[in-house]
Amino acid sequence: MWEYAIFIIAYLLGAIPFAYWAGRYKGMDVRKHGSGNIGTTNAFRLLGAKLGVLVLLGDALKGALAAYLGYRFFGPWGGIIAGLLAMAGHSWNPFFGFKPSGKGVASGFGIILVLMPKITVMAIVLFVLVVFLTRYVSVGSVLAALTVGILVFLFNEPMAYKVFAVIAVSGVVIRHRTNIQRVLKGTENKFNLKR
């Protein structure tokens, strides 16, 4: 029975605010600067490459660990449920009043890296290419997420992964809707990496 505690652990893993901690290390509250998100992109923009990479790794790791634990004890459905809980913990952080706090992209990549590594590599390559060409992280994130959603069905992955793709991709697109509107208006901030 105790193994069901993994799902609580997954949610709490997702809530670990790496970007917030990194900002505090630099004497900054990232919630009050940039996009206000405690996520990877805001960390890169505000804190520079070194801390940004650490936040990226931390955010991806919490998704990966949650998915691994869920899969280890409950198979594909467990991996997906635990992964989605980690994304929820990141995106609506309980330590900050459940307000929208991140978009869950890095955590999502951690999840699919564990459960669908081949698809992850393809999505990451597309993400890097799109961001390099457009300088829009939001466009790269949305297109990479949509790619995951398509490839899960093309590769006929287990039903659990298809359900995850529909939910997670929808979540990523919805959380980026204001970014998409700004891209269309030409007012979205382009990604310029601080050193």
Curated annotation (Swiss-Prot):
Biological role: Catalyzes the transfer of an acyl group from acyl-phosphate (acyl-PO(4)) to glycerol-3-phosphate (G3P) to form lysophosphatidic acid (LPA). This enzyme utilizes acyl-phosphate as fatty acyl donor, but not acyl-CoA or acyl-ACP.
Family: Belongs to the PlsY family.
Protein name listed in UniProt: Glycerol-3-phosphate acyltransferase 2
Keyword Mitochondrion found: no
Matches recorded under InterPro entries: G3P_acylTferase_PlsY
Gene that this sequence comes from: plsY2
GO annotation (BP), single: phospholipid biosynthetic process
Summary of subunit composition and partner proteins: Probably interacts with PlsX.
Entry EC number(s): 2.3.1.275
Annotated SMART domains: G3P_acyltransf
Transmembrane segments: 1-21, 51-71, 78-98, 111-131, 136-156, 159-176
Keywords on record: Cell membrane, Lipid biosynthesis, Lipid metabolism, Membrane, Phospholipid biosynthesis, Phospholipid metabolism, Transferase, Transmembrane, Transmembrane helix
Annotated localization: Cell membrane
